[in-house]
């Protein structure tokens, strides 16, 4: 689902923050920021490609904050089926498999993020999900009764799960 831009991960500081919100009617909105500290004045950091089949639901812009440069994608109105296609924002996205599904009244998030190729120990990689109801189980950190966050560690594979 969310993407990690792996090209700049091997050098310099990296920031990838992705967040999603799931509505009661199974519509997903959120934001992805992929940025790095520029190597020189011409370095724009990670860049997203907004040529998606549902491009009208995604807005891509430049990101420049706190000494980091890159891209920001804001999306809304995505279905559970469209969500994994966000990885197509970058040809460098790799090792990410996150999905949402509904089972009766439960919304279930399952995912796997492989950061074994990330050598930047200082990388700040987070993923958070806000659900339409109370989270009943998760292997992430509960930020609120309906919000879970994962701090993804460089060099390892992380699995994520949550039910609401």
Regions found by a protein language model. Name each.
Residues 1-4:
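Sec-dependent N-terminal signal peptides
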Residues 57-164:
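Mature, soluble, non-transmembrane domains
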Residues 18-20, 26, 127:
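Buried hydrophobic packing residues in well-ordered domains
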Residues 22-36:
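Post-signal peptide N-terminal segment of mature Sec-exported envelope proteins
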Residues 12-13:
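N-terminal Sec signal peptide cleavage junction
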Residues 37-62:
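Post-signal-peptide N-terminal segment of Sec-exported extracytoplasmic proteins
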Residues 16-18, 146:
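Residue-level marker for the onset of beta-strands and adjacent loop->beta junctions
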């Amino acid at each position: 689902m969310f993407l990690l831009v792996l090209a700049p991960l091997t050098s310099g500081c990296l920031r990838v923050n992705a967040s999603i919100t799931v509505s009661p009617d199974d519509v997903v909105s959120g934001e992805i920021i992929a940025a790095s500290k520029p190597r020189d004045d011409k370095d724009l950091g990670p860049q997203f490609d907004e040529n998606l089949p549902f491009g009208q639901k995604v807005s891509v812009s430049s990101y420049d904050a706190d000494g980091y440069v890159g891209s920001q994608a804001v999306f809304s109105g995505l279905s559970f089926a469209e969500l994994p296609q966000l990885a197509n924002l970058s040809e460098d996205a790799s090792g990410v498999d996150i999905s949402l599904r509904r089972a009766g009244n439960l919304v279930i998030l399952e995912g796997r993020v492989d950061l074994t190729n990330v050598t930047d120990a200082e990388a700040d990689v987070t993923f958070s999900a806000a659900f339409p109801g109370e989270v009943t189980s998760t292997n992430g950190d509960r930020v609120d009764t309906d919000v879970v966050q994962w701090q993804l560690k460089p060099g390892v594979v992380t699995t994520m799960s949550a039910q609401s």
